Amino acid sequence: MSTPAVPQDLQLPPSQRAQSAFKEQRRQKLKEHLLRRKTLFAYKQENEMLSSSRDQRVVTSEDQVQEGTKVLKLKTKMADKENMKRPAESKNNTVVGKHCIPLKPSNELTNSTVVIDTHKPKDSNQTPHLLLTEDDPQSQHMTLSQAFHLKNNSKKKQMTTEKQKQDANMPKKPVLGSYRGQIVQSKINSFRKPLQVKDESSAATKKLSATIPKATKPQPVNTSSVTVKSNRSSNMTATTKFVSTTSQNTQLVRPPIRSHHSNTRDTVKQGISRTSANVTIRKGPHEKELLQSKTALSSVKTSSSQGIIRNKTLSRSIASEVIARPASLSNDKLMEKSEPVDQRRHTAGKAIVDSRSAQPKETSEERKARLSEWKAGKGRVLKRPPNSVVTQHEPAGQNEKPVGSFWTTMAEEDEQRLFTEKVNNTFSECLNLINEGCPKEDILVTLNDLIKNIPDAKKLVKYWICLALIEPITSPIENIIAIYEKAILAGAQPIEEMRHTIVDILTMKSQEKANLGENMEKSCASKEEVKEVSIEDTGVDVDPEKLEMESKLHRNLLFQDCEKEQDNKTKDPTHDVKTPNTETRTSCLIKYNVSTTPYLQSVKKKVQFDGTNSAFKELKFLTPVRRSRRLQEKTSKLPDMLKDHYPCVSSLEQLTELGRETDAFVCRPNAALCRVYYEADTT
């Protein structure tokens, strides 16, 4: 049956498949495929031999890997180049490649193209992983990158085998507390605290359970189907086999839980030493890196979790197959469980201790500072300050040096006592000088020197008592009250003593003023009586002009004396302490009030009725008074209706401005200012 003819428009260009070079290429690919099939068959046979013997290992050499890569390069050289034109010598190259690649034995081919995972060859739970299979499509085409990875993997495997050999040659770390293959309690006590019986039994059972599965190996057939993480059922079958092989040892070597010195415990130690002597336990390189990277706490946790997993698988396998021996195996299970529990308690206790030690301990000063800040935020302030200066220095010293010897504290107390006695003696001397009448300046110098040397002496109430007693009796009460306020602000203690002293000073001042007022009233009354008697004795025959001139002369003398006394007071600063009005002189004024009374009107009528006295027409009193500057300034701005009806003059020259020249004035002393006139009379 012939195919229909294709039109020329739809015909494709002639293909290059008919050329000899591409035919040779297809023939080469077929030959490589057959060679790969032979290689896989040889690898399966070798794998069976390795699983049966378990002592042969595949060693890859660098030369063999290079030969394998050369073969792969020749195989992939003409791939995907069907439609490209090649030079004429390509056929010769392929022929040379064909004749240069002889068939190699199956062992060499497997070494060059097959990678076998030799990590942990003694571990029964890990099997070699096949990279190439018959049904895998990737195994039929090997690229350059795959060849490169193959070479690197072979180098890595070679390095791991060398490391394992070095680890095997290294000396084994001795067991702590062991002597001639047995653990001695006295040696353990020499480097750690003695553990409880439960801890000892759990440690012994842990060591026994750790050495038994590594010492006894399962059948080589099962190793190809057993893995550590993924295949759980095969792991359980493997564990049941080695537990069944070592069940006699576990029955013979059953350790007691509560007895310290029993024969069975010695047999446990002997069994442990015997198994550990026969078997060398090594860890793979990956496990080493993990153990080095982890901390001590994480290693304890991982070991405890691994112990728990091992206990679970062991208990399940025993329950499934070895049912006739429940007592011995349950004891082993209990003792193995006790070990991770104790480890967890130890790690938890350690973590708690570390967390407590990591937290900084708060000092008493910090607590006081936080308390004061909280009180300030709430608006609470201490009403009563601390007791004294002396007692405040002691807690600060105690906080800085909490641990001091007995003799140093005694010496500090003696020094503090002497210091307090010295300050108290100084204040008592000042009080004695005040009572004796010593000048104020000397006492102030002594007190100021004491305050310069000891600034905290202001917190003692005796200092403020001395200042209050220095003030003269004639000083105003405001000065005493100001001293009392300063003492309260400084925190003087005890403040009750200061209160009693202030009360005594005020009572003395009030009594002195009362006595002075009585004396001045008596003197004023006597002067008025003398004047009346002199007027009555002279009678109406007295010349009014002479009387007026005498009164004016007397008044001028009095006012001149008063002015001189005021000038002397302003010039003499020491006299300010003795007079009560000097401090308030700037705020007050002394003026003369011009007023009249019915008594004066009657006297005036008598004089006018007599007819002989026609020189003066008005008779008025002239009284010295004290007026406030502040009030005078305010009243001067008021209208005339609200001003005082009795005018006040500041000098005698202003009397002519008030009235006529015929007015007569009688000087009348003021009881409140009678001391001024009393002093003028005495001078």
Swiss-Prot record:
The record's keywords, sorted A to Z, are: Apoptosis, Cell cycle, Cytoplasm, Cytoskeleton, Microtubule, Phosphoprotein
User: Where would one find coiled-coil regions in this protein?
Assistant: none
Main localization, broad class: cytoplasm
Does the record carry Zinc as a key word?
no
Q: Where is the composition biased (Basic and acidic residues)?
A: 336-345, 362-376
* UniProt biased composition (Polar residues): 219-236
Tissues expressing the protein: Abundant in testis, thymus, and in tumor derived cell lines, while barely detectable in liver, prostate, and kidney.
- Phosphothreonine: residues carrying this PTM: T579, T582, T596, T597
Q: What cellular-component terms does GO give this entry?
A: centrosome; ciliary basal body; cilium; cytoplasm; intracellular membrane-bounded organelle; microtubule; microtubule cytoskeleton; mitotic spindle
Name the family.
Belongs to the CKAP2 family.
Q: How does it assemble?
A: Associates with alpha- and beta-tubulins.
Q: Which PANTHER family match?
A: CYTOSKELETON ASSOCIATED PROTEIN 2-RELATED, CYTOSKELETON-ASSOCIATED PROTEIN 2
The protein's role, per its UniProt record: Possesses microtubule stabilizing properties. Involved in regulating aneuploidy, cell cycling, and cell death in a p53/TP53-dependent manner.
Q: What is this protein called?
A: Cytoskeleton-associated protein 2
Organism of origin is Homo sapiens
Gene name? Answer: CKAP2
